Amino acid sequence: MNTPTLLVTKRDGRQEPIDLEKIHRVITWAAQDLNVSVSQVELKARIQFYDGIRTADIHSTLIKAAADLISLEFPDYQYLAARLAIFHLRKIAFGQYEPPHLFNHVTRLTEQGKYDAHLLRDYTADEFEQLNQALVHERDLCFAYAAVKQLEGKYLVQDRVTKKVFESPQFLYMLVAMCLFAHYPAATRLSYVLRFYHAVSTFKISLPTPIMSGVRTPSRQFSSCVLIECGDSLDSINATASAIVKYVSQRAGIGINAGRIRAIGSPIRNGEAQHTGCIPFYKHFQTAVKCCSQGGVRGGAATVFYPLWHLEVESLLVLKNNRGVEENRVRHMDYGVQLNKTMYQRLIQNQDITLFSPHDVPDLYEAFFADQARFEQLYAQYEADPSIRKKAIPALELFGLMMQERANTGRIYIQNVDHCNTHSPFN
């Protein structure tokens, strides 16, 4: 290579001539056993160098140069870019390419408030030594470029403001395993930790985002999704919104069972007021979901569930579509429609489905989930009761609307509540 003339700004502020031979060695190392051209990456990167360039920017330029060469004809550039990205990531996290000892790493980041202090209390120094010896840091080099960017952007512990990363992927996998099995019997837990670590680090199983990004941090978020049962009172509705904010900030996805909320026009306090219906409260939930991100990893997300026989179902099914106005749409949540055998039978037999406000038929709502025979008996009983507000709609028409909105939005889910309860491990 030609004698360099450009100056490089080091991390401590010093300037020195650019070392193109060092850059060549790094790219050659990353290109080992790959069908790529080292010189092509060098040429593509060098035209972007400038006098006074920082060393971190040189690394970023090399990564981008390799990533720009990824194509169907030359897919190996995705692994070259990934290896360069891992090299850069480790330099930022550890100040060097070689990762530190697991115990030293956890101690340092616990002192900085990045890791859960329980890690140091739950495991002995001897256990840390055994787990450190089991780490296979070479697996960091098996990722494709897109995977490294996903890890860097979402999953690795970092300062979400400055974007400084504090760990490498193998530490992520090992520490998640250590947190999940911390309270298993001491005599056997290391075998569980190691089996889990090897399974996730070799991509045999995958983990949900909240577990990967939060389980080893002080927030101690062990659940990826949280289900919230919403009642029909203002206290319950506001408690639901409060729980949404708390758990979204803790990185959890949200499921809201909002089927108990009474329909629009229902009496409140024996007719003292008239109910505004589900939609204003769904908007309240949407605001709660979107007011914080999932621990800085991604925006909050929620799915709201309601029964197909809810009196407002025709208005609820269209909440996500692009027609209508903001007042009658709640587009930034997903929806789950709850069905059972009775609903399907009405469809097959080309009969009507009768809609009720759950507040008017509370025992019907409870039986919908708990006792299908009881539900069928009560459903027929309330259909014949002239004192209860209701609306009959052809089952074919209602199912048609549901499937049309499901096809158009792709974000309306179907929950067969009777099937769920007979095939679930939960009581």
Where on the chain are the PLM-derived regions?
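Extended catalytic cores of very large enzyme megasubunits
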Residues: 1-427
